Each structure stands twice: as C-alpha cells, then as structure tokens.
Amino acid sequence: MAQRHLPALLIIMDGCGLAPADGENAVAAAKTPFLDSLYEKYPHTTLGASGEDVGLPDGQMGNSEVGHLNIGAGRIVFQELSRINNAIKDGSIAKNEVFVKAMDDVKAEGKTLHLMGLMSPGGVHSHMNHVEALVKMAAEHGVKTVRVHAFMDGRDVDPQSGAGYMSEFCAFLAKISEETGCDARVATVSGRYWAMDRDNRWERIQRAYDVMVNASDADVDPVAGIKAYYEKDPRGDEFVEPFAAHNEGIHEGDAAIFFNFRPDRARQMTRVFTDKEFDGFERKQIKLSHFVTMTEYDPTFDVEVAFPKTFPENVLADVIAANGLKQLHTAETEKYAHVTFFLNGGIEEPKEGEERVLVASPKVATYDLQPEMSAPEVTEKLVAAINEGRADFYIVNFANCDMVGHTGVFDAAVKAVEAVDDALSKVVPAILAKGGFALITADHGNADHMFDVASDGSKHPFTAHTTNRVPFIIVDEKAKLTGIEDGRLSDIAPTMLTMAGIEPSAEMTGRVLATEA
C-alpha cells in the first residue's frame, strides 16, 4: 500500500474559468497576488469543464451540477441530452422498453401515438433529431397513426426560424408516410409561451391543451399557419397562438410521448394530462394508455420515463469512507447542494465519517451588492476545522465567481474573484501547515467573460457560463505533473486519491494528472 499523504484539500472556485485578458475577463482583471504566487511556485495545468469533457454535447457550456457530478465521480458522467443522442446514434433507442411498450399497445389497439414537445434544433429543452427518431421508430414498429403537437421555440433559436424547420419536418413526415404507410402528420402548433409556461399561468397552458385534445375540422398547412402569425406578430415563434393543423383530437386509449428532455417547462402540461387532482382549470380529462416523458420531470408524477436519472457509484466520497477516513464538505447556501448531493453522485445521505458545514449566503437582492458573499465565513469555519484536524479530506466550494458573474456587473465580479483569492490565502497555508496538500480548480467558467462586444463596439453584459477551460493547481512541494495535456474534471478524484496514497475505485476511468515525485 502506498504511503498515506494527508490531509488533502480540494478547492472549487465556482465559475472561475481561464481566458485571455481582453477587458471582458473579470478573473484576469482582478488583483490575485496569492493565486499568482501559486502559479509561480507549483505545478499547474488546465481542465476541460464543458461539452464532451463532462458528458454534454460538443460545444455546450458546463454548469455547477454537471461539474460537481464529474469531479466527484472520477469519470465522465453522460448527461441526458448526450445519453439520448447516443441511443439514437447506436440504435439502442429502438429497444427502449418504455417506448416499445407504448408503441406496442397503440399498434395492437389501433390507436394514435401523440408526440408533443418543443420543435427546435436548439438543444436546450429538446432537439428535432429526437422527435424525428421517435416518428421513424413508431413507423418501423408498425404504428399506423402518429400525430405531432409542435411547440414552437423562438428563444433558443432565431425568433422567426420556425417556419423553415417546420417545412423540413413536414417533408420528413411526408417521406416517412410514403415509405412506411404510417399516417404521420403535425396535428397542432403552439408557441412555447402558451404550451411551456412554468409560472402557473394556467390560462396559457389551457389555450394549448384545448387545441390539442379537441378534434377540429381545420386542415391548415403548419408552415402557412406559422407564417400567417409572423405577419400578425413579428415577435415570432414563441408567441404563435395555438392552432389545429390536422387534428382529430386526443382520445381514450391513445398514448403520448413528451419529448422534451429538460423538465422545468414540461411539468405543467404533463400535470394537466396526468394529475387526477389537477384543478388549475376546467379540462377535458383523457385516460391515455401511456404518458411517457423523455426524462424524469418530477419524481411524484404518474408517468413512464424513457431515460431515468442515472447516478455514478463508488465516487470520491465513497472511496474515502470505504478507507475509514473522515471528510468535511463545506460551502455557502448557493452551492451547498453541489458540494454535497452532486459531488457525492446524486446521493443525499452523508457517507460514514462525512461532516457537512453549511454557511448561509447573504440576504441581498443581487450578489453584486455583496461580491464577497459568505466567503469570509466559509473560510473561517474551514480553517478552524483544518486546525482542529477534524477530517482527512476537506472539500470546499467558493460561490463568488459564478453567482456574481451571473449579475453581469463587471466591477463586482472583479471583487468576487479578489474575495476568493483572499480566502485561498488563508485556507491553503492552513492545510500546508498540517503537512497536507491542496488541489485548486473550478467547475466551469463564468466570470472569465462578462461582456459581449457588438460589431459597433458597444458592450452588452454576458451573464451565462462559458466553455473555457478551468485551472488545476497542485499545491504540494513533492508533486509532479504526469504530462497529460487534455485533462478534464473527471481526472480530479483519481489524482487526489492517488496523491493521498489511496487506490481510486475501479469505476473511476479518469486519469491521474499528478503524482508524488
């Protein structure tokens, strides 16, 4: 067995990515004397924290949930969108038991399969590739009638792009119908403003629901209907008023698949279809043979889920506990779930020997008003715990760069970065004084890009995450990089365990980026 090297400290500077100092980068603009000294003295590299490096589609920004899940798992954890894309790519979607059962039953009973969701290539709530794959699967499965209830986007894509991709989709349906004999058509069209409300404005949902479930004599070309709405309201697709294109209605014994993979704007419509106690408005209640959701929208919903949540096993916290060691996880409120639930592989219950320290986030309207947030209090409690020797592994999240970055206020974001630097100047010496080592990283970028610059030179606040790589600093006198250039977040846990003299779990496919010289 390798010699133990403890205590170990993992510092996650939430939202602190790496980018050139271009005047839009609060991380580069901040005065960070302590971090600068670490870069000069200790081995360091960068890690991928977005796209395929964290189980997301290529080019998609990371986030705190995904970042912490990958950090703790020590392997790439594929997210729902990537899992669905992979199932389509390798053909395994055709064997998905939930889809197959729904299609078997409507085929046997001569009923209709209804597909509803956001008709968009945006990839934020849904993807057109997914509904096309479902139509094709149903046709090949022998389903005779497929009706699509299309919710138009206009937010995650250009406001008036819907007519173009609806035209392509209708051509796809016509081709499928001709080749297979399956009668596949667009039944209804609704802007997401109506069909995907998430603020309990039930009158909006009702407008879309009533059009979907009630039969209509209308025979409207979906593309023509959308274009007609553009002339009425140039705001475009998001606000397209619900209309029937070719709709016989939704009837008892039919089956429905909601193909959105993101839950938040799919929950209300799902409730109307499935909640027997629903009282948001007077509705025509229909007993469907199946109501399938692409992913889990809410664990309390009475639905079938095609791609249920999966969580990794034998993560960092499990390995620490299995070795009889103590661990302490700490953060302020805004990131407490990330450094506990998500870091621990989606498990709420603390591990054996795990202590959790929650510090309340400040009660301010927006965090640019207090950019240091609760970093001083988190720091004070963590340093005290280290000095008392309360754990073998310490894991801390500093929320500042992310939460203040989201406000879009550049000067405040600079102060947030400086507050994190000040915190590090206290916690890192504390762990070194105990003969331990520290790993410093981030879960994704944010404060590293605070403005978009328009063609006329004007600046507009950029409040989203970035796809930039994140830092990885190994604060240890004896550490030596292994030379891997394309590190990613999933390499952190194997590296930390190896440096501590502990064998990573067999499930950890991440690589070791540094060892003891």
Q: Where are each of the predicted segments found?
A:
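Feature captures the catalytic ectodomains and active-site-proximal regions of enzymes
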Residues: 1-517
